[in-house]
Regions:
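Short flexible coil/turn linkers enriched for glycine and charged/polar residues
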Residues: 14, 25-26, 69-72, 179
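Active-site-proximal cap/loop segments of hydrolase catalytic domains
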Residues: 126-256
Length: 256
């Protein structure tokens, strides 16, 4: 897992020029033209931040924590240099961990608004993504899906132990399959978080998986399994599906 994102945007076959986009969590997107023959590069476009932005005021860190089964999970941290690491800072922990989608480090003006208010932004590169290759994905899908949830919990506990934040000062955030992650985690560790942000969350995952008439269900079999035709898949999905595992207990604040 790297601390920047670089994309080849375009190559004109009639010239030696290629266009490259570059950004980091603290550096707005920049587009360069690079000449393959002369090895020269030129900045041709830069993302404008109307309120102003100085990348030197921020820190991007790559941390690693040990998961429940010994696997090492990367975490990307973006924060202001002046934010204190004494356990009193608010922290937003973002997670997804499905379909082999990797959460690459890139710039976001939306995140910047929070970071400028001394909120630490953390991204957990948990299994189910492919930040560490195909095996990283396979270890977070089908009958290994709970690794995704446990990895996220391990990241939250690690950040608390290292004084980046503390219990009741940490917010979880994820959307769609990341909303499934938030739902499963909050059912297991409700006392660990101040709140959860679930964007279009996939929380009634068992009912959805059982209904093959829905347009997206069959396409989900490779990721989550086929609960209708496989008893092991049914039992496993039932054991973590957020809607089926709601308990009579105090939950943190939840925004859907």
């Amino acid at each position: 897992v790297y601390d920047s994102s670089v994309y080849l945007m375009q190559r004109d076959r009639d010239t030696d020029d290629i266009y490259i986009s570059y950004s980091t969590p603290k550096t707005p997107s920049r587009t360069f033209v690079y000449n393959l023959k002369t090895k020269e590069k030129k900045l041709v476009k830069e993302q404008l931040i109307p309120s102003g932005h100085n990348s030197n005021e921020y820190i991007v860190e790559r941390l690693e924590c040990e998961g429940h089964d010994g696997r090492i999970i990367p975490i990307t941290i973006t924060r202001k240099k002046t934010t204190k690491l004494d356990g009193n800072s608010n922290l937003l922990l973002y997670g997804y961990g499905s379909y082999g989608n990797s959460m690459w480090p890139s710039f976001s003006s939306i995140r910047l608004s929070l970071i400028n208010r001394d909120i630490i932004w953390a991204t957990a590169h948990i299994r189910g993504g492919m930040e560490r290759g195909m095996k990283w994905w396979k270890e977070g899908k089908l009958l290994n899906k709970k690794n995704t949830f446990q990895d996220y919990i391990s990241c939250a506990k690690f950040l608390i132990d290292k004084k980046y934040t503390s219990k009741k000062k940490i917010i979880g955030m994820g959307g769609s399959a990341g909303g499934l992650l938030m739902g499963a985690v909050v059912n297991e560790k409700p006392d660990l978080f101040l709140g959860m942000i679930m964007a279009v969350p996939f929380v009634d995952s068992l009912t959805t998986n059982l209904d093959h008439s829905l347009p997206l269900t069959i396409g989900e079999f490779d990721e989550f399994g086929n609960a209708k035709e496989n008893k092991d898949h049914f039992k496993y999905i039932y054991s973590y599906a957020p809607y089926n595992n709601i308990k009579k207990m105090d939950y943190p604040n939840i925004l859907i």
